């Protein structure tokens, strides 16, 4: 009788730097115990589709490859959200996939949405319709927090956050130089739907003049007054860092379309602020830059010593 344990691992939600390194850690730890690792492809879809999409991962075919040093997700990911009324159905499909593969546990590497779903799978929270299926099946679900927003609780820094800060900080440094050359106030719009950690860290590290975050409602007059103070000090340029999900003094999001499941999709607040500043203060021209997906794609370990890890050659 084969008593070898089988564990699954999947990445869910938006990708970020460090995912492949986490997968490698799971593979290596399992290999030391003689366990088998099933990499589920394309997030939860890989486990709920027929046939199940997976790849057996080993130290030989994965850990020793170039992938653990690169950003993105080797397994692929999924970022479309789940309606609460469909969570029970999805839980059932998820459970069937786990049973079909014979998994003893599954590791979910995801952000706040994925962690909430993990909690629902295990506890039946969030909706009265949610079946307590996986707990009844005795499934062990392990959540590893990853998000460039750094908005998952009970962890100081989530996987992907530091690399995203580095990208945004580099952008602030670059914008400071070009803003000085053209005597402009440049706006950097960064990700951050409900949390301003990314904007705050980048603004502090890059010494930006203004930082706007979702947690603190902003007033356009305060921004104008700061720009006037910068001008009065004799400096001819400024940099503003803004989270995509900031709110006005009434607590309202100013920009935000909806996706297919009714969640707000943010973006465009930089252009809005630029127009508002230009209407009220003519001393600075404004321009807008966005880091967007670049925050997700900085390599976990960058090439060094003249060697490119992507092609494994000099």
PLM regions and their residue ranges:
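N-terminal phosphate-binding or glycine-rich loops at protein starts, especially the Walker A/P-loop
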Residues: 2-51
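C-terminal non-catalytic interaction/assembly regions of soluble proteins
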Residues: 264-314
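Short beta-strand elements at the ligand-binding edges of bilobed clamshell
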Residues: 154-165, 296-303
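Short, ordered loop/turn segments at secondary-structure junctions
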Residues: 12-15, 40-46, 79-80, 111-114, ...
């Amino acid at each position: 009788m084969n008593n070898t344990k089988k564990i699954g691992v999947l990445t869910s939600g938006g990708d970020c730097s460090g995912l492949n390194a986490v997968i490698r850690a799971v593979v290596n730890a399992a290999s030391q115990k003689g366990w088998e690792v099933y990499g589920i492809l394309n997030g939860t879809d890989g486990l709920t589709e027929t046939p199940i999409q997976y790849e057996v991962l080993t130290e030989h075919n994965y850990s020793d490859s170039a992938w653990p040093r690169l950003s993105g997700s080797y397994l692929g990911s999924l970022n479309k959200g789940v309606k609460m009324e469909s969570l029970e159905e999805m839980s059932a499909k998820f459970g069937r996939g786990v049973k079909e593969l014979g998994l003893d546990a599954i590791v979910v590497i995801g952000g706040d949405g994925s962690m909430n779903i993990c909690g629902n799978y295990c506890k039946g929270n969030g909706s009265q319709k949610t079946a307590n299926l996986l707990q009844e099946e005795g499934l062990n679900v392990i959540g590893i927090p990853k998000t460039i927003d750094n908005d998952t609780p009970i962890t100081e820094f989530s996987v992907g956050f530091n690399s995203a800060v580095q990208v945004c900080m580099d952008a602030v440094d670059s914008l400071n130089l070009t803003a000085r050359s053209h005597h402009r106030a440049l706006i950097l719009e960064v990700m951050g739907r409900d949390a301003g950690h990314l904007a705050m860290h980048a603004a502090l590290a890059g010494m930006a003049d203004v930082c706007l975050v979702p947690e603190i409602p902003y007033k356009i007059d305060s921004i104008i007054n700061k720009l006037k103070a910068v001008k009065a000090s004799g400096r001819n340029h400024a940099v503003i860092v803004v989270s995509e999900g900031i709110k006005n003094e009434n607590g309202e999001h100013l920009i935000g379309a909806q996706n297919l499941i009714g969640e707000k999709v943010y973006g465009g607040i930089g252009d809005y602020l630029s127009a508002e500043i230009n209407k009220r203060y003519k001393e600075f021209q404004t321009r807008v830059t966005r880091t967007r997906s670049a925050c997700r794609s900085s390599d976990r370990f960058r090439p060094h010593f003249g060697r490119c890890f992507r092609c494994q050659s000099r």
